[in-house]
């Protein structure tokens, strides 16, 4: 038996967020939507569940240290009772280059992690399993599987990155970093180049909606 995992990664250096403080708060009124709040060095999510509220501060360790970020996180929740102590989660934004290596297939968080967005992660898990079954049934090569999954992961990375880059906020070094990446032309490029000709997490219409929402001029 041979169990080999390829640990070669594709680094995603433009993505700055690499930490998150998370905790549970006592439930008050239930909102029917998730709140995403821009913060000076990242963003905060607030999700109301049946018996608690989950919240977290996603930030970049390049621009704020863990102690200061914890103090800010607590201050934003000062009017709410914490029912769990804040917990620090760390990661390095990356994509695994070859998730299928010999007789090992990496699926889930080990396959890549960019940003703590649960719906994206769930989709990538389902997609990876579905694609693996198709490849096995068609006797496709691991290289074909890796190429397809890697492309979808990179598409996910690119789409998330554009949400940071297209914002109008530039009042802190964190947001200025993204502002200086000059992303707008890439929005329509993703829409115009080879439309609907390859597997993507975000279809062309989604890129078009992104361009329209942020009022990005067409090339």
Please describe what each predicted stretch is.
Residues 134-219:
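Long, low-complexity C-terminal extensions of enzymes
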Residues 50, 59-167:
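FAD/FMN-dependent oxidoreductases across multiple families
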Residues 21, 32-34, 44, 86, ...:
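Generic preference for hydrophobic/aromatic residues in regular secondary structure cores
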Residues 1-80, 129:
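Predominantly flavin-linked oxidoreductase catalytic cores and closely associated redox partners
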């Amino acid at each position: 038996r041979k169990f080999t995992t390829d640990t070669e990664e594709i680094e995603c250096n433009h993505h700055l967020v690499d930490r998150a403080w998370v905790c549970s708060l006592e439930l008050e009124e239930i909102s029917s939507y998730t709140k995403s709040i821009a913060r000076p060095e990242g963003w905060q999510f607030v999700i109301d569940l049946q018996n608690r509220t989950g919240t977290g501060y996603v930030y970049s360790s390049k621009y704020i240290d863990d102690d200061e970020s914890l103090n800010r996180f607590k201050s934003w929740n000062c009017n709410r009772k914490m029912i769990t102590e804040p917990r620090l989660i760390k990661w390095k934004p990356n994509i695994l280059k070859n998730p299928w290596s010999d007789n090992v297939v990496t699926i889930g968080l080990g396959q890549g992690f960019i940003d703590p967005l649960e719906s994206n992660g769930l989709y990538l898990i389902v997609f990876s399993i579905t694609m693996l079954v198709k490849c096995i049934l068609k006797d496709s090569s691991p290289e074909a599987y890796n190429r397809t999954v890697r492309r979808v992961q990179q598409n996910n990375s690119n789409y998330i990155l554009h949400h940071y880059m297209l914002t109008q906020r530039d009042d802190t070094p964190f947001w200025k970093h993204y502002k200086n990446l000059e992303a707008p032309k890439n929005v329509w490029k993703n829409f115009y180049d080879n439309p609907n000709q390859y597997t993507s997490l975000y279809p062309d219409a989604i890129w078009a909606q992104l361009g329209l929402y942020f009022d990005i001029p067409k090339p």
